[in-house]
């Protein structure tokens, strides 16, 4: 048989089963270790593609397709989420370099924090490793040809050369600019080898290198975020996680602006020192940096660069620090305590970003004004995005509750409009409340109906199979038949005191109880003096009148009439099998050739139990009646024999005394009265010794119709 070209991509090892390749359970989610294991495995295992070409070409094709990763594979999708998180962390690590310059207040010079240099460089290198892995993945990840997306998912391109050309022409340049270790080079290589003031060079180089790399790193996050949402539909699994994700972006922006505020504050103080040094005779610029050996004092800088608020400056010759006055007056630029600097600057950024920069009093310095404008615009955009996205995520957690409130309000208005009695209203409210508690507003049938058939079958097996096997009637069935039954079952709910079916109504479905208790009662067609009730619990079933009707190929279109009334004693959860579905499944019953199923049905059927009990009781009453009649006959025969013997004695004696004649007359009268009483007792037996009218024997379900019976 010839097959068309198959575009499916599978990681397949001929020596192992498919389930062992992925190593994922049905409910398991890949962890970080699992992702790295799958990454390693993905580069070792070639892809398996169906082909119709000659074996030599197949081997060549297998070699060229080696190490190609399926973009729809779960481990790659999880890696994209991890890399997206790593990109956010990278944006948070880069501003740490801005805290390296420190002002030495004692010597009035600029120095560097060597410990922070090493720590920030190591963290930046660790995050860059994620970028390297991502670039390698991009050279090994297949893509869907745009021209093939007219129908379906499109054709997967697995050629390594085509993949490389596509990546080189798209995001490779951005990824390359993002991964360049410019801050590490500045801190660990450039600074130790220059003869100029190290603090000044470090401050300037770090500012430009990090800002230059920030742009491609931010640009790379947007297509990555789009790819994650396109393949998996979501970034976070829960609404609260989504709200936290958007809040973290807002906090990241606060951290970035706080770090920039710190660095520019140091720059403004350094600028003030330079201007003061130019005006002071004998001042050398290089002595403004602590790494230079010097024996001079810079105490004049204290009076030349006072830290005054912009509103307190009356002399135009005084240096205006603008919005950076707070950082200088608080001494945060002079502190060697990193966490003190970090949290103070973070709080400044968060406060002004939330206030949209309204309280910032700037100087006439253009860079400071641009910085304040960027805070205002960024705060406006980020705050709008934060509120909008958090509202969207948080509303998703309450949308079901709102639907429930609207439904309850509509139900109350409808009940009031129709003037329903209070007892019916209570039953409706109780049903809606119980249904909400069980389903949380999710329409399960609609959700399952939109899924593929095989997936729907697996879900139904997961939901119903274990519960069905608790029902003895299903416990002895094979897996194929259970699959057919599971696919047609639908969950139903019954509130307390509600009627499932009434005696004399058509039976439209068979019910299998999973939780709760019911009572099944019958009056044997309304016959006076007859009543039978049986309690049903979990694993019991009712509506068995439908089974003989469904098993009969010649049955009419009219549903059978129920012989029992079934009422819920508590809240009941059950699975229902409708008459049409049972009719379609019944053909598989007839293929079982099993007497065991027939005996099991009889044993657990309420109708068969009732009929069996009535039959046994009737047989017992017949036995008691026959035993009583036999004892009465024996007593009558004994009395007759006594009378006969007395008559013989009377005829043999020719002469008798008056006393003997009186005794004979008394004995004769006693025997006559005893026989009369025996006959009267037989005709007036109590009802428990009489044979009542038996219930109609249930219809025998033909499990082997049109088939030979097993010996």
From Swiss-Prot:
InterPro entries found in the cross-reference section: cNMP-bd_dom, cNMP-bd_dom_sf, Ion_trans_dom, RmlC-like_jellyroll
Molecular function, one GO term: cAMP binding
Residues annotated for a nucleoside 3',5'-cyclic phosphate binding in this entry: 473-603
GO CC, one annotated term: plasma membrane
Regions of this protein lying in the Cytoplasmic compartment: 1-81, 138-170, 226-243, 388-711
Biological role stated in the UniProt entry: Probable cyclic nucleotide-gated ion channel.
Protein name according to UniProt: Probable cyclic nucleotide-gated ion channel 10
Organism: Arabidopsis thaliana (Mouse-ear cress)
Gene name of the encoded protein: CNGC10
